[in-house]
Amino acid sequence: MANDMAVIPEVWPVAADRVGIWLVSGDDAWRTMAVASDSEPHFEIELELMARGVRDRLAMMHSTSWRIDGPRLIVTYMAVLQAEDLVKGIWPGARPVTAKLLDAVGKPPVHAPDEAPAPRYIDVLAHGLRHLRFLMDTDPANAAAMGPLMRQHLEPLSPALAGLYAA
């Protein structure tokens, strides 16, 4: 008999400064343990942000996608963190996320219409950033919470859901 599929929340914490957008967590998202039946993913992400010492800098958080990863269901969140100064000065391990980077890695692998997508981690991050860009146009409260620098650096991105996996 098969076991139940674990639900694993992940958060991609990003911050913006005058230089650009940065992935505060470095090279990957932060993931929690499986969600207990008396909890839920959003709460687990808040606990993870507290454990990482960044909850007090949270400007906004939004669930952007989900995917299957082996025996797990990954629930993805983007967290926009506030930085009053240069991001690298606050989080030395932060990595820049630029439009050039997203262009350089190209589109996700193509799949047939009846197949599940198999996104790379960079595709998940790119989708999350484009989702934030979409919120700039559709959700005034979240757009305001992002702050002017994040909005400025997200502006060149276009929401690209339809056709993202097309050849």
Residue ranges and their predicted role:
Residues 1, 45-47, 122-128:
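Polar low-complexity intrinsically disordered regions
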Residues 1-31, 56-61, 78-85:
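N-terminal strand-loop-strand
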Residues 10, 40, 44-48, 84, ...:
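Glutamate identity and glutamate-enriched acidic tracts
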Residues 24-36, 67-167:
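Nudix hydrolase/Nudix homology domain
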Residues 30-65:
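The catalytic Nudix box helix
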